Amino acid sequence: VRRTNNEWQTPKAVHNDGWVINGCPVNGPKAAVSSKNIAVGWFTVFKGDPQINVSFSKSDGESFDTPIKINDYNAIGRVDIEFLNDDEIIISYMEYDDNGTYLKIKKVSDNGDISEPITISKIDGGRSTGVPQLEIINAEIFLVWTVFENGLNQLKSVKLNSISI
């Protein structure tokens, strides 16, 4: 939903995936704003294929570009996004393959360019990990997630220089 001229506009879908879930999804969308773009990242299941998508708006949310599929393997979701600059985001997400579940990040530009994934950590795919959180502060990328070790929930974190991504 957008607010223009002090009035709320009629809500519009970022993209109509056609996904229906009977219950409360763990995966909600995440949005980020730069001085010229809005980006939304979300988990969906499209024709039986779990996906993580990103879509950019260059019109202050009036319309969104065709979604860009992010995941390479089986998506779990748990998405977070932040803008690196006006044209590029970092997206964090979880996906799994035959060897386990992983927390990964990618850089995505509003022109559709996608970086190779960076694996941050092997991670438990269950709900106990929560939703990993991503922030960019002074050109440094911070990721924090929950792990269950030694009978306790603990936080793990990593700091990356955004210039090296």
Language model region names:
Residues 1-165:
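Extracellular, repeat-based ectodomains that mediate carbohydrate processing or recognition
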